[in-house]
């Protein structure tokens, strides 16, 4: 696709948890728990006006859902601050120092004062209906093969509560994550190449890994800002796989281009969205459709000029009707029906004609209907009407969720600046020059610098060095290089062997650096071969044995040279005909036999030398 032609513009937001001892505004620990909660609280949240007297549209839409929020609390992971029953404590200086470190690594200008703001969030993930956040730095940059990318802002904020499950009338959240320090890094929306977007996400991720940040599933989240000429800005939240970024961008661009084409067709047709909702239950009084017959009521709306367009595919497997259904689902229905896909689902051709007649649909009109409890169905159809009106205008500004296949799904309207207002319970925090210079003098080594150094100092390949850096294993690697052992063997053990053993079900996470030292020491003193290292480590992990005991149990301690010679002599004596026929050509097959007999108990070079000598003696 010609990105320049479509006017593609992209930006990136990365949210990363910091690895601090306590939360941002209270002393609770920053670990997650799956134990039973010590107590629960229930809240209902409502939007408030900004300082300019405006409501944020995203917050307003959430409030319309009128959900009850249940919060699970714990003695060690939560306190009255998370419950919004106690004022926040002073800002965690450890979190601010980590945030400043990250900002300096991103070439950013750190602000003089940290002012805490409230960002309105009433989806239930914050008990007070807002998230505390503050600006740490601005005006940074990163270099990529495609050019310089500006880093606009770095903010320090609270992470949200964990969404656990939905109930009949609301949502259950766990408060252990609420308040964990988080940095939000935002680039400017100037990127026009999806590969550059991926590269920036990778670089920022590597920089974050060089500082004190949490690791593991859910500790980092990437959001994409995507727009095209004649389209709209869309925020795609929850991108987990960096390799999926180009696919997500391409599919979002396709979606917006398709919506622009639909808009043009609707405007050419003079399409009109009527707000009248019809009760068409009588049309389906004798229906054989299980979905329809089990519903309390069947309501419908006529969309003039929409015929054939609701079923238009805008992303692989998703249509304009899917977009309408996503809006309707926010009001509690499981889906919608529309005439572009009917007859289907047990609905007959005759019933479709009756439906069209009941709402007065002409040729060129479409009908959308919902089967549900009456009030819920009405609310759902109001959302369909709203989304249909947007379709006539073009592409709506939205926050969307990234799906595993690269598609995106509507979440809520794009937030506005009306969601921000000052936090009055927390004083400003001055970032003194002494603090800034102290952090600057002790900046960590960047991942790219670390990779180049271990390649240079230890003779590692780029692949091995990259794996050690990516998996944060450089410190362990350098600690093990005290032994006179090939550094490639040590690097391979850490980067590949342990990961393979973990996948096979071996409990290698229970092995510490001291246990690995003992295993490598056996290799250094010549008691085992490098080929035996994998099996010995697996045995140590599974049975809790010391390295030498594991080697002895597996019969993998190296044989003396005279013992190796005796075994090779037997192999040669048993294959004299082959040696007579092939000469030194028998070396390969006999080497295979020898290594099979001596597997793990002899160094391959020693076996090769002795076997060669024995064959030559017979020629």
Curated annotation (Swiss-Prot):
SUPFAM superfamilies: GAD domain-like, GatB/YqeY motif, Glutamine synthetase/guanido kinase. SMART domains: GatB_Yqey. It is an enzyme of class 6 (ligase). One of its GO terms (cellular component) is cytoplasm. It catalyses: L-glutamyl-tRNA(Gln) + L-glutamine + ATP + H2O = L-glutaminyl-tRNA(Gln) + L-glutamate + ADP + phosphate + H(+). One of its GO terms (biological process) is glutaminyl-tRNAGln biosynthesis via transamidation. Coiled coil: none annotated. Keywords: ATP-binding, Ligase, Nucleotide-binding, Protein biosynthesis. GO terms for molecular function: aminoacyl-tRNA ligase activity; ATP binding; glutaminyl-tRNA synthase (glutamine-hydrolyzing) activity. Its EC number is 6.3.5.-. Belongs to the GatB/GatE family. GatE subfamily. Heterodimer of GatD and GatE. Allows the formation of correctly charged Gln-tRNA(Gln) through the transamidation of misacylated Glu-tRNA(Gln) in organisms which lack glutaminyl-tRNA synthetase. The reaction takes place in the presence of glutamine and ATP through an activated gamma-phospho-Glu-tRNA(Gln). The GatDE system is specific for glutamate and does not act on aspartate. This is Glutamyl-tRNA(Gln) amidotransferase subunit E. It comes from Methanothermobacter thermautotrophicus (strain ATCC 29096 / DSM 1053 / JCM 10044 / NBRC 100330 / Delta H) (Methanobacterium thermoautotrophicum).
């Amino acid at each position: 696709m010609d990105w320049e032609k479509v006017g593609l513009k992209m930006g990136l937001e990365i949210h990363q948890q910091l690895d601090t001892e306590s939360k941002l505004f209270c002393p609770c620990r920053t670990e997650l728990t799956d134990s039973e909660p010590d107590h629960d609280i229930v809240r209902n949240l409502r939007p408030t006006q900004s300082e300019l007297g405006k409501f944020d549209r995203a917050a307003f839409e959430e409030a319309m859902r009128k959900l009850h929020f249940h919060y699970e609390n714990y003695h060690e992971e939560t306190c009255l601050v998370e419950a919004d029953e106690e004022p926040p404590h002073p800002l965690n200086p450890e979190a601010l120092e980590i945030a400043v470190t990250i900002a300096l690594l991103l070439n950013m200008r750190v602000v003089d004062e940290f002012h805490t703001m409230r960002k309105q969030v009433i989806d239930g993930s914050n008990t007070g209906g807002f998230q505390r956040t503050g600006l740490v730095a601005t005006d940074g940059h990163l270099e990529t093969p495609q050019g310089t990318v500006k880093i606009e802002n770095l903010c320090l904020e609270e992470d949200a509560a964990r969404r656990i499950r939905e109930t009949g009338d609301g949502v259950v959240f766990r408060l252990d994550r609420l308040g964990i320090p988080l940095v939000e890094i935002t680039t400017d929306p100037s990127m026009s190449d999806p590969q550059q977007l991926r590269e920036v996400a990778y670089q920022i991720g590597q920089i974050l890994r060089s500082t004190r940040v949490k690791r593991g599933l859910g500790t980092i989240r990437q959001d994409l800002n995507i727009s095209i000429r004649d389209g709209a800005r869309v925020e795609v939240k929850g991108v987990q796989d960096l390799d999926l970024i180009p696919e997500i961008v391409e599919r979002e661009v396709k979606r917006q281009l398709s919506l622009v084409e639909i808009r043009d067709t609707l405007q050419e047709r003079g399409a009109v969205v009527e707000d009248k909702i019809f009760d068409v239950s009588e049309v389906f009084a004798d229906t054989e459709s299980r979905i329809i017959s089990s519903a309390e009521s069947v309501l419908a709306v006529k969309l003039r000029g929409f015929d054939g367009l609701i079923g238009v595919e805008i992303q692989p497997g998703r249509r304009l009707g899917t977009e309408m259904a996503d809006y309707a689902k926010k009001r509690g229905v499981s889906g919608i029906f529309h005439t572009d896909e009917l007859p289907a689902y047990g609905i007959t051709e005759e019933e479709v004609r009756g439906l069209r007649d009941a709402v007065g649909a002409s040729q060129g009109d479409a009908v959308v209907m919902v089967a549900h409890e009456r009030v819920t169905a009405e609310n759902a159809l109001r959302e369909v009407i709203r989304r249909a009106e947007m379709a006539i205008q073009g592409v709506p500004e939205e926050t969307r969720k990234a799906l595993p296949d690269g598609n995106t799904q509507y979440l809520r309207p794009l937030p506005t600046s009306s969601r921000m207002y000052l936090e009055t319970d927390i004083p400003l925090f001055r970032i003194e020059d002494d603090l800034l210079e102290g952090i600057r003098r002790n900046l960590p080594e960047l991942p790219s610098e670390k990779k180049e150094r271990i390649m240079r100092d230890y003779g590692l390949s780029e692949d091995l060095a990259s794996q050690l850096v990516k998996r944060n294993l450089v410190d362990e690697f350098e600690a093990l290089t005290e032994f006179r052992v090939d550094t490639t063997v040590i690097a391979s053990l850490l980067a590949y062997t342990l990961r393979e053993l973990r996948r096979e079900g071996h409990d290698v996470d229970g092995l510490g650096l001291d246990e690995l030292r003992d295993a490598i020491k056996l290799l250094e003193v010549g008691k085992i071969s490098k080929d035996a290292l994998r099996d010995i480590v697996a045995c140590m992990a599974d049975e809790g044995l010391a390295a030498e005991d594991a080697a002895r149990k597996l019969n993998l301690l190296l044989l003396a040279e005279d013992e190796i010679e005796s075994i090779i002599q037997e192999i040669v004596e048993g294959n004299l005909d082959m040696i007579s026929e092939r000469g030194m050509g028998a070396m390969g097959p006999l080497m295979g036999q020898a290594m099979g007999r001596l597997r793990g108990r002899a160094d391959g070079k020693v076996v090769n030398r002795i076997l060669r000598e024995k064959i030559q003696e017979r020629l």
